Design a protein with these regions (language model features):
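Short beta-strand/turn micro-motifs at beta-sheet edges
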Residues: 64-71, 133
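Acidic-leaning, charged glycine-interspersed low-complexity segments
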Residues: 95, 103-153
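Long, highly charged amphipathic alpha-helices
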Residues: 9-13, 95, 99, 103
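Conserved aromatic-histidine-acidic binding/catalytic patches
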Residues: 2, 88, 92, 134
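Acidic, proline/glycine-rich low-complexity IDRs
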Residues: 145-171
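Oligomerization/assembly interface segments of phage tail-like spikes and tubes
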Residues: 71-91, 98-100, 139-150
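Small/polar-rich, solvent-exposed N-terminal microdomains that initiate assembly or binding
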Residues: 1-67, 162-165, 170-171
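Residue-level signal for secondary-structure boundary sites
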Residues: 53, 89-91, 152-156
Length: 171
């Protein structure tokens, strides 16, 4: 599984469940290479860290001269979620962040991602920092983190050994 696979699965499920909650708001992957200017109302998420868990697993399934070598590593990625709201149907940025946090912790979200090979761990508490925006006004920037787990795989070309001839010599 790749970073893009995980981010697409998370974004798709967030959009689906926000729509079910009656909240039609864009969900953006943060820090994209092309910026299009300021948006007023959106939810942004981005990876904040990634850690391998345990040891890398190796398995083999020989097929002819190919060893069928496969390596797998369980990873845990931390996503940070933020909401930027100027004016959105009476919701504040904290309201939207709280709804998204509830969605991340919900059974439908967890189960939908589990079916795609992504595990979801409990979201953290909401942080409430403020910053000075591009107009010189204070703006609330609530955020929280949650972790997902998934497996990355690697299939290196490894030749299979077909015969081993011991050659033992006396010393």
């Amino acid at each position: 599984m790749t970073d893009n696979d995980v981010e697409i699965a998370v974004r798709k499920q967030l959009l689906a469940q926000l729509a079910q909650a009656g909240i039609n708001i864009p969900v953006r992957a943060g820090f994209q290479s092309a910026k299009q200017g300021r948006e007023d109302n959106f939810v942004m998420f981005f990876p904040a860290g990634e850690n391998p868990q345990g040891w890398q697993k190796r398995s083999y399934n020989p097929q002819g001269s190919d060893a069928g070598h496969r390596e797998a590593q369980q990873y845990e990625t931390t996503f940070q979620v933020q909401a930027f709201i100027t004016e959105f149907s009476g919701y504040t940025a904290k309201d939207i962040t709280a709804v998204v946090r509830m969605i991340v912790n919900s059974l439908p979200f967890v189960e939908a991602l589990r079916k795609q090979g992504v595990g979801v761990q409990r979201a953290t508490a909401i942080r409430l920092p403020y910053f000075v925006n591009d107009r010189g006004d204070y703006e609330q920037n609530p955020s929280f983190d949650f972790n997902v787990t998934y497996t990355r795989t690697l299939r290196p070309e490894t030749a299979a050994v077909t015969a081993l001839y011991p050659d033992i010599h006396r010393i």
